[in-house]
């Protein structure tokens, strides 16, 4: 009965709210395709190509109900088992081609990336901002990507270690005390704080920080809702909060310009780089980025920095908790650094984070196992041939990262959590936790730094206990343990810390 009620609920939700949002988008895809079938030898050649195998399901709805009524990973895995590494389906009214091989992922994301553009529903672009870099291709995207990469390069991250460490320390201190809390929610707060310090440096006042946090949380709650602008709906509230974010960011930018004098003002952080960045206009003139462009990219970076990283951090805590021997080995590695820093009296350094070999392997294996980004969306900008199959113009194309990460051909015994597999680098294009190509996540090193610092602080100064069942997974929209992994956290006494440190290191060296 519970399953029946769940199925009825999902069916009603999809038919009444989700599907209509995508029908207009995908109707235009079919129209463009009809126009593009004008003929000539090229079209006759493409007509002879086969579409990939697969099922398109029911008209308009496609196989959306099958996807949403079961674990999406089971859905995609069963499709691959039946049809192979390239197959078609119809989701939310959109025809899609799924690709589950490293070669196909590289084809779409790297070698032939010009034939596939990033695609997002218009409601998502409105929420984040149409000028955010990951909605674009071409010169504008490359210019902004270079700027973001410069702000997140090793030299820049080296200076951020104390700020990241302080954010981690504050998050764990607020959580400790033995009360039950959602790990995911605690990690979201941490990731937001790290995102803020990355964008604004140490220059953001408490008022602006809290205003950003409050309004961003409203935007986040409405991001995945049906785009209904009726007053009182989550989406309408999110749109209003997004407008307030724009006003807050304009105020921050204006204050910086007033302090910084001419030009773009700013500073050495990401916001300063955005304020100094110049954009080539249509007439070839050079102009500073507008306040709208700056705001869109700040919100975009906050969005990219929070939920995905928080999800991985949550899984790391679970995997370590469920692997006691591995946890002891990680403690030994981190306690050696802790003792070298005189029991935490000296600050953690960038060089020390580079020496955390086992912890880094744990992070990589957590990224593989959890596969937070299970797939990515692209859209074919032309009819494309791949391995004898036709990918029609306008169809959605989805490289399935999770299927690749869990393929025993590339990772032996893929359902086993085994960090030692990363003692050897994986084969090219088989490990894609941050995507690949020009649209790969530019903040991957920042995310890994946050994870390394969190593990260091956690295992050297705290102990934790998971409360309740943690094997079920929920999608919100990224996979996390059910309920966000409820857990208790306790601070260890300083004397106990040093005793454990000496004992752990001695045992590890025996």
From Swiss-Prot:
Keywords: Heme, Iron, Membrane, Metal-binding, Monooxygenase, Oxidoreductase, Transmembrane, Transmembrane helix. Its cofactor is heme. One of its GO terms (molecular function) is heme binding. Heme binds at residue 441. InterPro entries: Cyt_P450, Cyt_P450_CS, Cyt_P450_E_grp-I, Cyt_P450_sf. The keyword rRNA-binding does not apply. This is Abscisic acid 8'-hydroxylase 2. It comes from Oryza sativa subsp. japonica (Rice). The lineage of its organism: Eukaryota, Viridiplantae, Streptophyta, Embryophyta, Tracheophyta. The gene is CYP707A6.
């Amino acid at each position: 009965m519970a399953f029946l009620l769940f199925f009825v609920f999902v069916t009603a939700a999809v038919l009444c709210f989700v599907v209509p949002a995508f029908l207009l988008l995908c109707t235009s895809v079919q129209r463009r395709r009809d126009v593009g079938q004008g003929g000539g030898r090229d079209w006759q050649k493409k007509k002879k190509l086969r579409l990939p195998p697969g099922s398109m399901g029911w008209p308009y709805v496609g196989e959306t109900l099958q996807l949403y009524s079961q674990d999406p990973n089971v859905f995609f895995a069963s499709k691959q088992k039946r049809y192979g590494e390239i197959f078609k389906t119809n989701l939310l009214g959109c025809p899609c081609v799924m690709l589950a091989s490293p070669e196909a992922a590289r084809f779409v994301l790297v070698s032939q990336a010009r034939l596939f553009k990033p695609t997002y529903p218009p409601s998502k672009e409105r929420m984040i901002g149409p000028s955010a870099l990951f909605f674009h291709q071409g010169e504008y995207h490359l210019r902004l990507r270079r700027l973001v990469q410069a702000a997140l390069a090793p030299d820049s991250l080296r200076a951020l270690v104390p700020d990241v460490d302080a954010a981690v320390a504050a998050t764990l201190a607020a959580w400790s005390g033995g009360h039950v809390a959602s790990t995911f929610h605690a990690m979201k707060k941490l990731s937001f704080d790290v995102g803020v310090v990355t964008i604004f440096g140490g220059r953001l006042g408490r008022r602006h920080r809290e205003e950003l946090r409050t309004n961003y949380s409203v935007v986040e709650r409405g991001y995945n809702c049906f785009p209904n602008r009726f007053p009182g709906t989550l989406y309408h509230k999110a749109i209003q909060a997004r407008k307030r974010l724009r006003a807050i960011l304009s105020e921050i930018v204006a204050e910086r310009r007033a302090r910084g004098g001419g030009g773009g003002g700013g500073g050495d952080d990401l916001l300063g780089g955005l304020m100094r960045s110049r954009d080539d206009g249509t007439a070839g003139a050079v102009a500073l980025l507008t306040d709208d462009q700056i705001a869109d990219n700040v919100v975009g970076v906050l969005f990219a920095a929070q939920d995905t990283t928080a999800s991985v951090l949550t899984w790391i805590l679970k995997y370590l908790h469920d692997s006691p021997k591995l946890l002891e080995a990680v403690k030994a590695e981190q306690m050696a650094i802790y003792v070298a820093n005189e029991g935490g009296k000296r600050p953690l350094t960038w060089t020390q984070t580079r020496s955390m070999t086992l912890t880094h392997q744990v992070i990589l294996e957590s990224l593989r196992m959890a596969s937070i980004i299970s797939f990515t969306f692209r859209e074919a900008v032309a009819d494309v041939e791949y391995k004898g199959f036709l990918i029609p113009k306008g169809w959605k194309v989805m490289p399935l990262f999770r299927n690749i990460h869990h393929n025993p051909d590339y990772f032996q015994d893929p359902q086993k959590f085994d960090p030692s597999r990363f003692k050897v680098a994986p084969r090219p294009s088989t490990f894609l936790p941050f995507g690949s190509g020009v649209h790969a996540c530019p903040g991957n090193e920042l995310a890994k730094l946050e994870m390394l610092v969190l593990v260091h602080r956690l295992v050297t100064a705290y102990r934790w206990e998971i409360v309740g069942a943690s094997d079920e997974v929920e999608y919100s929209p990224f996979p996390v343990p059910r309920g966000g992994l409820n857990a208790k956290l306790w601070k260890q006494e300083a004397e106990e810390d040093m005793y454990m440190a000496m004992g752990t290191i001695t045992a590890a060296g025996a």
